């Protein structure tokens, strides 16, 4: 795949270091769900962030030639739409067979532990010396800028408050949010350096 895209959910939080190395070795782009924030490093130029709820993220996903979803049920509160947006092969990876609810044609379900898969892909990519990418850092940065502007326009001023608060918070702060405007914006614009450090009541 030239435009390989991963989506990481909360079930992929273990082994983030290996996941980050695998993404780089594969030249892959990525999204996370809200529960998966922090799995991908904030310095990864091909990371689109936790932006699946942005309507135009479906267009980005549709431009990938393979989409791999690891450790996520793709909940309604992550997408806010009926379809992820993929136009090619979708691979679902999970240890829970009940997560394989997608009945679309062209879906490959793999019952497997996500971290084990990422380690295997890393080893394979390094053996093949596969690091070229069909994605560019510029297109990712442009998408992220548009999505931040859209979020700020919908709830003005909160994104700047998020930036200011994040500047004075330790990286290992454990955050628990509730159903507030601040939390909704922060989930979109607050980059996490570690997985499993922001907890929000999904599926209420």
What are these regions (language model features)?
Residues 2-14, 176:
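Glycine-rich phosphate/diphosphate-binding loops and the adjacent beta-loop-alpha structural elements
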Residues 139-204:
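Active-site diphosphate/adenylate-binding microenvironment
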Residues 34-138:
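Glycine-rich, acidic loop regions that bind phosphate or pyrophosphate groups
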């Amino acid at each position: 795949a030239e435009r390989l895209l991963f989506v990481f959910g909360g079930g992929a939080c273990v082994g983030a270091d290996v996941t980050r190395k695998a993404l780089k070795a594969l030249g892959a782009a990525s999204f996370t769900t809200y529960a998966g924030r922090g799995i991908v490093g904030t310095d990864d130029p091909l990371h689109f962030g936790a932006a699946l709820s942005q309507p135009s993220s479906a267009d980005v996903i549709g431009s990938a030639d393979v989409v791999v979803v690891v450790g996520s049920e793709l909940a309604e509160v992550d997408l806010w739409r009926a379809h992820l947006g993929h136009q090619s092969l979708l691979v679902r990876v999970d240890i829970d067979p009940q997560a394989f609810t997608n009945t679309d044609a062209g879906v490959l379900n793999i019952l497997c532990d996500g971290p084990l898969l990422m380690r295997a892909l890393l080893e394979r990519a390094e053996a093949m010396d596969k690091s070229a990418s069909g994605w560019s850092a510029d297109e990712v940065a442009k998408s992220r800028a548009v999505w931040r502007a859209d979020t700020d326009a919908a709830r003005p001023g909160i994104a700047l408050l998020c930036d200011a608060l994040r500047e004075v918070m330790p990286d290992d702060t454990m955050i628990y949010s509730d159903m507030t405007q601040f939390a909704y914006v922060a989930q979109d614009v607050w980059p996490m350096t570690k997985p499993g450090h922001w907890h929000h009541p999904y599926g209420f």
